[in-house]
Regions:
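Catalytic alpha-helical scaffold of carbohydrate-active enzymes acting on polysaccharides/glycoconjugates
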Residues: 2-213, 239-266, 272-316
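A structural motif
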Residues: 206-226
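Binuclear metal-dependent hydrolase catalytic cores centered on His/Asp/Glu-rich metal-binding motifs
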Residues: 221-241
Length: 316
């Protein structure tokens, strides 16, 4: 199956359909579990960063206004993630020797070099989450392209490695094409519509067509819902939702049942899940999956490479 964005109707509502491929996860795993830690603190909308107004998204405030000057409370909420929350989350993974993928905004990482070094030393993957954590929907294409190049350059300088995964999040209709234009990305995660990776046919700006591996992300198994009206008010419902999702997918991967292993993504934010009253949801979930066998906890790059090896890029 290939998602063909070059067709007159560029959406694919069919996907793998009734017969998804067997993922063949390493060790015969029934599920691949993938944790993403979004590191955005210090790159959010702020007049200090040259933006028109203060941040409005994913904080402790309900429907905050965007001010054309510094918003001290909003800055403090974001600073909590960088000063305290991120370390609380990292400790949970370090004590369990589990890997994760960091969606790192380059300006944020640049403002916290000690943390960037810690990510690398702990063996976590850093995927590029753009230059600034802003909405690119109406940003001129040339500006978005320049931001992407600068973001990659910063990560290269700070880590000594080129980012192999891309996720903008607040993307634009141009983002996927620009990712293909740059090339060299083993996966793109700006997609939420499947439980398995898949190949997408993308037309580059020069008119050529290339396959791009998509490793889907999630907005439901995501602590961002602590900051949404219809979301979680405390740790218990978030833990229960993660547990229910895992249990359902684990059952689908049972060789004696559906025998259809999938992947489960979990999205985390330092300023949200890193709070003491919320971290217990993560702790309980990690304890829950540790009680099951045939569970592969992996970085996104590991999943991408596994998929590309088992299901090579199509030729066209």
């Amino acid at each position: 199956m290939i998602y063909d964005t070059t067709l007159p109707y560029p959406r694919d509502l069919i996907g793998y359909g009734q017969n998804p491929p067997h993922a063949q996860w390493p060790g015969g795993a029934r599920i691949a579990v993938q944790f993403v830690l979004n590191y955005e603190e210090g790159a959010e909308n702020a007049v200090l960063h040259g933006d028109a107004g203060s941040e409005q998204f994913l904080s402790e405030m309900f429907n905050p206004a965007s001010y054309p000057e510094r918003h001290m409370s909003m800055e403090g909420i974001y600073e909590y993630g960088a000063r305290a929350g991120v370390w609380r989350i990292l400790r949970e993974f370090e004590k369990r020797k589990l890997p994760l993928t960091v969606f790192g905004v380059s300006n944020a990482l640049q403002r916290h070099p000690d943390l960037t070094r810690a990510f690398v030393e702990l063996g976590h993957e850093i995927a590029c989450h753009g230059l600034k954590w802003i909405h690119y929907q109406h940003i001129p294409e040339a500006v978005e392209r320049a931001h992407m190049q600068e973001a990659m350059d910063i990560l290269q300088r700070m880590t000594g490695q080129r980012a192999l995964g891309w996720y903008t999040g607040r993307d634009s209709p141009n983002t996927r094409r620009l990712v293909a234009d740059f090339g060299g990305f083993e996966y793109d995660s700006d997609y939420y519509g499947d439980d398995l990776p898949f190949w997408m046919k993308v037309r580059k700006t020069d008119g050529s067509e290339v396959p791009q591996l998509i490793v889907p992300y999630t907005l439901d198994c995501n602590d961002m819902r602590f900051a949404l009206p219809q979301g979680y008010s405390h740790a218990d419902p978030f833990y229960q939702y993660l547990k229910d999702t895992f249990d359902a997918l684990y059952a689908e991967g049972d060789p004696a049942g559906d025998n259809a292993p999938k992947m489960m993504s979990i999205g985390m934010h330092c300023r949200l899940l890193g709070r003491p009253g919320r971290i217990t949801a993560l702790q309980r979930f990690l304890d829950h999956i540790a009680q099951r066998d045939k569970v592969w906890v992996a970085r996104r790059i590991d999943i991408a490479r596994h998929w590309a090896q088992r299901f090579p890029a199509p030729k066209f």
